C-alpha cells in the first residue's frame, strides 16, 4: 500500500504493467474530477475515457468489443444473448454502441424529469453499463470512472475525499459477481435492483 501511494504521487517509477495501469487509472480519475462539468455522458465520451485508460498500454482502448460473450437476458434491460455465433463482429460492436447510447439517453431523460433521486438514477445507469459489458477489458474500472463522473455531476464530489478504488473493493467485487452470476438471479428483476441499490448506496 505504501508503494501504491508513492506510485500515485510520482515518488517512484512504474516497474510493471500493473503499475502503469494504476497511473492510467489515476490520470483518468484526475481528468474526471477536474473537467466533469464539461463532460457529456454519451457513447463518444465513454470511448474516449476508455482510450485514455489504455493510453500507455498494448491493449487497444477506445473501442467496443466485437467478440461474442456469454451473457443471460434480463428483464431489467434488453440485453443480447451472445451464446450463439450468428452475429457478425461488426453487428456486435454496433449493437453495443446502440445499447450505450440508449442508457445515456435514458439517464438524461430521468434526470430532466426530476422525479427520481439522482443516486438511484446513477445506480441504474451503472448496473446497465456493467451488464452490457461493452469492452474486452476493464469494464469494472470504467464503471468506477463513470460512477465518479455522474456523482460529480450531481454535486456528490466524492473524488475529493476518497478514491473510488475503494468503491469496488475485493469483497464487494466478489459479492457482485456472485449476485449476478446465475440466470435465476437475472429473472428476479426487483430482487436484483434492490440488492444492487443496497450495494451501490452502502
Indicate residue ranges for each PLM-predicted region.
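FIC/Doc superfamily catalytic core
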Residues: 1-202
Amino acid at each position: 500500500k505504501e508503494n501504491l501511494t508513492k506510485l500515485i504521487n510520482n515518488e517512484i517509477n512504474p516497474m510493471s504493467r500493473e503499475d502503469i495501469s494504476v497511473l492510467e487509472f489515476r490520470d483518468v480519475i484526475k481528468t474526471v474530477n477536474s473537467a466533469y462539468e464539461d463532460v457529456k455522458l454519451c457513447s463518444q465520451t465513454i470511448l474516449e475515457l476508455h482510450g485514455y485508460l489504455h493510453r500507455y498500454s498494448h491493449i487497444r482502448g477506445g473501442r467496443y468489443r466485437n467478440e461474442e460473450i456469454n451473457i443471460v437476458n434480463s428483464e431489467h434491460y434488453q440485453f443480447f444473448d451472445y451464446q450463439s455465433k450468428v452475429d457478425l463482429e461488426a453487428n456486435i460492436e454496433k449493437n453495443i454502441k446502440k445499447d450505450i447510447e440508449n442508457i445515456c439517453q435514458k439517464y438524461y431523460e430521468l434526470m430532466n424529469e426530476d422525479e427520481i433521486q439522482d443516486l438511484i438514477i446513477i445506480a441504474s445507469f451503472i448496473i446497465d453499463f456493467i451488464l452490457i459489458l461493452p469492452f474486452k477489458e476493464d469494464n469494472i474500472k470504467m464503471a468506477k470512472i463513470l460512477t465518479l463522473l455522474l456523482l460529480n455531476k450531481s454535486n456528490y464530489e466524492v473524488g475529493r475525499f476518497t478514491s473510488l478504488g475503494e468503491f469496488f473493493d475485493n469483497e464487494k467485487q466478489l459479492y457482485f459477481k456472485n449476485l449476478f452470476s446465475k440466470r435465476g438471479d437475472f429473472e428476479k428483476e426487483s430482487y436484483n435492483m434492490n440488492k444492487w441499490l443496497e450495494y451501490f448506496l452502502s
